[in-house]
UniProtKB/Swiss-Prot annotation, chains A, B:
PANTHER family associated with the record: COENZYME PQQ SYNTHESIS PROTEIN B (PTHR42663:SF7), HYDROLASE C777.06C-RELATED-RELATED (PTHR42663)
Family: Belongs to the PqqB family.
Source species of the chain: Gluconacetobacter diazotrophicus (strain ATCC 49037 / DSM 5601 / CCUG 37298 / CIP 103539 / LMG 7603 / PAl5)
UniProt protein name: Coenzyme PQQ synthesis protein B
Gene assigned in the entry: pqqB
InterPro entries on file: Metallo-B-lactamas, PQQ_synth_PqqB, RibonucZ/Hydroxyglut_hydro
Length: 307, 307
């Protein structure tokens, strides 16, 4: 069994974004049922429905745990069903929630070496005592059997793999700070119980041949739903950057996500990490219809998929 | 006018704390009306009811803004009524929320040099572009007239002053890591519109003569309500540290906060930064009665005081 809960479906900033007065964010603030609020992207995954691994620690993690009974402590005075945290990148919206998980609670922190380097470079993350929360490097393309803090197998094996992406904004430097790289700075995650195969890829700058081959025939794929069109933030007047500049391919258009997945025979396709500028967030948008007709679901906070 | 909104009333970890299964946290999770949830300590203060300064950027800041209509954007596509953020320390629970305020939105970040040094030492805070969010050092005991980002006076003057405290846990080092110091690492904040005098002191290791003199006759004081008794976390089996070890004086007992304020003639006294182990959080606790009878209010998320 792969049991999966969407803790947050939105991209960095969430929906609504704190400083956005754009129409969609106003609808979310007004509790419009067609524009439900979404926190920042994260999932929890379990092989037994009892012990969970949080994939990406969003800034909203404290609220996300509060809203998710499966993640509430159940034993003793201090405990957690969260056995570990896996990071697919070092962006603010994937690591900030680690600061919520202090309080001397054992769990395992798993990330690739470039992401662990980013944490090492920020002493604030020493709030997680390394003797209690070990930092375990993940090697690209090496299957890694998840275990509970006591060593018991968790029933899931993950395989991290590099996807095209960019370094976090706060770590940009050098002559080409926005270069798209594929070095493990941004990863996708394959998850399997030995039978089913699920993927979590919240950020991806472009589809590649090897990625296409990897995903073909998968049972479940969560994929980068940041932007509907590459220039939507510019056109809406809410930002200066294209999706490509931010390291995200767009959902629509030639070479977009819908296009790229058309012949991949993935059983269940779910968009996640959806920016507040993306009309997919609105249940009554024509873009939502287009995505649905192409076989895509739009994730929402609390969505649960068991496969 | 000093207009003040409590964004969060709880100490670090909030109430309920993510990994606490103690009875009080279970009551909060069960929506017991006598144990309402509280987010991590922060206030917003305004001299005109329209432009706000957030004092301490808690990890819950995104949710706190969402719950506070006064802090919602009102103009254009991107804007905020938040003119600045003032930090009284460099703890995880006072700085993490800065990472929520990215998105190229101008405001001013004000803190003492030791706290700015802690931010400087953590490149993740470069997510706030210094050309858009200037970092302004506050000098101890120097009145500082708050201004809006366009330079307009905000109608409030703050004076930061050192209070006994300790360095953040993640920055502890040396032979006496928990030493109580009074060097500006932890500050209190005096706030005035020229007529009224309010104070915000969410962490204080002990009452001193100069602090007593400063607070005498104040209109409003928010004060460290972390623990009811110094050893309550040890006795409850939920922690190894006393309040003194964490840099917080306790509310009750000889030399405690109630005792220390007994003859200070403060018009309105409000406890804030209340730990989830503190029975003051429970409306039906005898300790709450004792505090009320001594003239203290217990702050809650959304509490608004205009003085």
């Amino acid at each position: 069994m792969i049991d999966l809960i969407v803790l947050g479906a939105a991209a960095g900033g969430g929906f609504p974004q704190w400083n956005s007065n754009a129409p969609a964010c106003r609808r979310a603030r007004a509790d419009d049922p067609a524009a439900p609020s979404r926190t920042q992207a994260s999932i929890a995954v379990s092989g037994d429905g009892a012990h969970w691994f949080v994939v990406n620690a969003s800034p909203d993690l404290r609220a996300q745990i509060g809203q998710t009974p499966a993640l509430h402590p159940r034993h003793g005075l201090r405990s957690t069903p969260i056995a570990g945290v896996i990071l697919t990148g070092g962006e603010v919206d994937t690591v900030t929630g680690l600061l919520t998980l202090r309080e001397r609670q054992p769990f395992t922190l798993l990330a690739t070496p470039p992401v662990l380097d980013l944490l090492d470079a920020n002493p604030i993350f020493e709030a997680l005592d390394r003797s209690i929360v070990p930092r375990v490097p993940l090697a690209l393309d090496q299957p890694f059997a998840l275990a509970l803090p006591d060593g018991t197998p968790a029933g899931l094996t993950i395989t991290p793999f590099a996807v095209p992406g960019k370094v976090p904004l706060y770590a940009e430097s050098g002559p080409d700070p926005a270069a798209i790289v594929e070095n493990g700075e941004t990863i996708g995650l394959a998850m399997t119980d030995g039978v089913r195969h699920a993927y979590f890829i919240p950020g991806c700058a472009r589809m590649t041949g090897p990625l296409r081959a990897r995903l073909r025939g998968a049972d479940l794929v969560f994929f980068d739903g940041t932007l509907w069109t590459d220039d939507e933030m510019l056109r809406a007047g809410v930002g200066q950057k294209t999706g490509q500049r931010m390291g995200h391919m767009s959902v629509s258009g030639d070479g977009g996500t819908i296009d790229a997945f058309a012949d991949l025979d993935v059983r269940r396709k779910v968009l996640i990490h959806i920016n507040n500028s993306n009309p997919l967030l609105l249940a009554d948008s024509p873009e939502r219809q287009v995505a649905h007709q192409a076989g895509w679901e739009v994730s929402f906070d609390g969505m649960r998929i068991t496969t």
